[in-house]
Design a protein with these regions (language model features):
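Active-site palm subdomain of RNA-directed nucleic acid polymerases
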Residues: 21-25, 69-75, 175-217, 288-292, ...
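C-terminal reverse transcriptase regions that engage the nucleic-acid substrate
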Residues: 35, 192, 197, 232-333, ...
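A short, polar/acidic, helix/strand-boundary loop motif
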Residues: 105, 160-177, 361-390, 415-418
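Catalytic palm subdomain of template-directed nucleic-acid polymerases
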Residues: 88-94, 104-110, 141-144, 189-228, ...
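Conserved pre-motif C helix in the palm subdomain of viral-like polymerases
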Residues: 58, 126-129, 140, 159-192, ...
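Reverse-transcribing Pol proteins
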Residues: 1-113, 194-199, 204-205, 245, ...
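RNase H catalytic domain
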Residues: 383, 393-449
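Flexible, low-complexity interdomain linkers flanking nucleic-acid-processing modules
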Residues: 1-9, 251-278, 434-501
Length: 501
């Protein structure tokens, strides 16, 4: 309460960095979005407008008028034309209008600017006690489209043809372009107290007084770069906030209760498509549930059928899966300053590779994260020592950002690393693995699989994913051990932004 007036005064001072209405998007001149077409793909695409009912036409007409008034779009005679799509907003009957740019995206050279890692961002919150999350108003619409690229964004409507002056949702490079803008803005901050993923910004501090100062600095860069915040979506001075689909606090990382409730209330799928949707939804959180793969192994086969046939056994696993999510563990943050080493458990079975990362914190071994993947055909025939090495490499790659520069304990139920070091001549995949492993500092602790419950259980289950047709020389390449990739998360975040904003 004592800081409420301070925060109110702060946002009043930076009122020019706060959106005044739903069409006040801000305007940056720091960067522009340029669409580069692939060589030989310069031929314009011209598609017809899709049929709309009277209510949809009225909604679209209103949207176009507001966009044109705000300088987001302009009339055009472009040879390009794409259809509009109305997306129902979250918890509302209103429509949010987007353009179907799928054919344009196929012709576009992809921007190589990397998105920040979700896992890395979450781990950087370690030690923080106070959080604020900031939501950008319109986000992409603050960025100009390069004049030479505007005609490529043209769209057709019953009210004429228009093109975007500002960057719209739906362009394949929009996320990378906006991420570049936010990174450019945040790099001027004198410290590491703010993180961004697309338009989701979190400020984290260990006390309130410092947090208020840091919030001021973030508001200042928003002012300097012409970006605006949607105040109704900002959460300030919180001990716990939702960030990137997770609930974060001083204690650790949790699943968002509303998402867990959706899982618990999910009806029994009757078609393969419905089952695939369910498995995809829970996949975002599979790093919290070590035995999720065991419970979903049969479902991953069932989803391939048009109609799903449930047995008492598979229906019971579906029920147990929901229970597991209601009892999900808290993932602790990796403590880089602690003298306690990280502990990496790895294991191999004929079906899977598995790894679990933990660390002793406050006298207890705390769970930080887990990963597992299905073995491909070649790996299924590996002898024990080679399979264990494959699991070690997989685990090191998964948690490389944590383990690379800090000594840790490697617990495995085989003398695999000693075997690798004992080889007089090393070539092929062993040479690549050895070269990679030698970049880490660790102590090997032999531990039987029966005592190593986390990684052992993970590797003894079947994991979804197509791992066939992998050549021997490709087996050492990095693989994503979680069900959802960053690019899928970007799509998920943008899709939800379309529905909610």
């Amino acid at each position: 309460p004592e800081y409420r007036r301070v925060i109110q005064d702060l946002f009043m001072e930076y009122s020019d960095a706060v959106s005044k209405n739903e069409f006040d998007y801000g305007h940056t001149t720091a960067i522009q979005c340029q669409i580069q077409l692939k060589l030989g793909e310069e031929e314009p695409v011209k598609l017809k407008s899709r049929p709309l009912n009277p209510a949809q036409e009225a909604s679209l007409k209103e949207q176009l008028a507001e966009w044109e008034k705000s300088g987001i779009i302009e009339k055009t005679q472009s040879p390009w034309a794409f259809p509009m799509v109305g997306v129902k907003k979250k918890d509302s009957d209103k429509l949010r209008w987007c353009v179907d740019y799928r054919l344009l995206n196929k012709k576009t050279v992809k921007d190589a600017y990397p998105l920040s890692s979700i896992e890395s961002n979450l781990h950087k919150l370690q030690g923080a006690k106070i959080f604020s999350t900031l939501d950008s108003a319109g986000a992409y619409h603050a960025v100009e489209i390069h004049p030479e690229s505007r005609e490529c964004t043209a769209f057709t409507t019953p009210f004429g043809q228009f093109q975007f002056v500002r960057m719209p949702f739906g362009l394949s490079n929009a996320g990378a372009c906006y991420s570049r803008l936010v990174a450019l803005a945040l790099q001027y901050l004198p410290g590491h107290f703010a993180l961004a993923y697309l338009d989701d910004i979190v400020i984290f501090s260990d006390n309130i007084s410092e947090h208020v100062k840091e919030l001021r600095q973030v508001l200042d860069v928003h002012r300097q770069f012409g970006m605006k915040l949607k105040l109704s979506k900002c959460k300030v001075l919180q001990e716990q906030v939702e960030y990137l689909g997770h609930l974060v606090s001083e204690d650790g990382i949790r699943m968002v209760p509303s998402y867990v409730n959706k899982i618990l209330e999910w009806p029994l799928p009757q078609t393969g498509k419905q089952l695939k949707q369910f498995l995809g939804f829970i996949g975002y959180y599979r790093g919290f549930i070590p035995d999720v793969a065991e419970l979903t192994s049969e479902m991953n086969e069932m989803k391939k059928s048009a109609k799903v046939t449930w047995t008492p056994g598979t229906e019971e696993k579906f029920r147990k899966l929901k229970e597991k999510f209601s009892e999900s563990p808290v993932r602790s943050y990796p403590d880089y300053k602690s003298e306690e080493p990280f502990i990496l458990d790895t294991d191999f079975s004929s079906t899977s590779l598995a790894a679990v990362l933990s660390q002793r914190q406050n006298g207890e071994e705390k769970f930080i994260g887990a990963g597992a993947r299905k073995c491909n055909k070649a790996e299924q025939n590996y002898p024990s020592h080679k399979g264990e090495l494959a699991a070690v490499v997989m685990g090191l790659r998964k948690f490389e950002h944590i383990l690379r520069y800090k000594p840790f304990i490697l617990r495995t139920d085989s003398r695999c690393v000693q075997f690798l070091n004992s080889l007089k001549e090393v070539s092929g995949i062993y040479a690549r693995w050895l070269n990679f492993i030698q970049g880490f500092q660790f102590e090997v602790v032999h531990r039987p699989g029966a005592k190593k419950q986390n990684a052992y259980a993970l590797s003894r289950t079947e994991h979804d994913g197509d791992s066939e047709h992998v050549r021997e020389e490709e087996l050492d390449q990095e693989e994503d051990v979680y069900a959802v990739t960053d690019s899928e998360v970007e799509h998920w975040l943008v899709r939800n932004a379309c529905k909610s904003k």
